[in-house]
Amino acid sequence: MSTTAVPSAAAQKQLKQGKVKKGIFSVIRHLVLALLAFIWLVPIAWLLLPSFSTDKGINFTRFVPESFTMWNYVSIMTQPDSVAQFPRWFMNTLVVACFNCVISTCFVLMVAYAISCCRFKGRKLLQNLSVTVNLFPGVLAMIAVYFVLKYMNLTNSYAGLIMVYAGSSGLGYLICKGFFDTVPVALREAAKLDGASEARIFFQIVIPMSRPILVYTIINSFLTPWTDFVVAKMILNSGVSTDWTVAIGLYNMLQKALVNSYFSRFCAGGVLVAVPISILFVIMQKFYVEGITSGAAKG
């Protein structure tokens, strides 16, 4: 004969109170998340909606335009003038971003592999020094970097800009190092016994196994010049608008004398700048997140 235990009244009351508290915390949590999502979405809407507006200036009276048009996008892409030369800016930024993507990715991965897998004198000191340098903002070195580039006649050139981006990328090797730390030592030792050099192990064994961290590094290397304003403004300071990157060009459109004529086109340009980044992230999101988590967990 089986018996079923019946909860006492006190136990039932305690269980009910626990469910109520859990429900209240759940509601509060969702309200906070909804508020954060709203705060995050407002700037996006503030950029997106005016880009479809028929009003050109910044002093519009409605958050949602009365009528929508694609003219701002068509104008900024197909009708460049002395102020808005967006196609040229876009191509300039794309060229710099692609070159930096290739150079920085190779640089970061090689540095990370050397620190993680190679044993040499001063390795620990070099690693600690790089971590210490990372504690200081890069803006502190901008004046020195500018005068070095000026001495080398590399100001107002894309080569100088790419050198700065690529040269500063190596300090971001820590997450990649954390990923390479997870590569089995026995795998590398077996390859060495077969006569493989360190370079061959890196390119033919480690890199094919490291797709998540490779994607993570590529995206970060592309985003740096694509979204940067400060370094680009410092180096490309000749005033020739055809040499500008997207960030400098769009910033120039917000000058007091221009903003009332170009604000809607500025918003359209901002949306167009975000499109390649969004597409790149959506396509590679899985590998990007995996690269961060796997590298950070070990590093």
Model regions: which residues?
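A structural signal for multi-pass alpha-helical bundles of membrane permease subunits
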Residues: 6-7, 18-21, 25-299
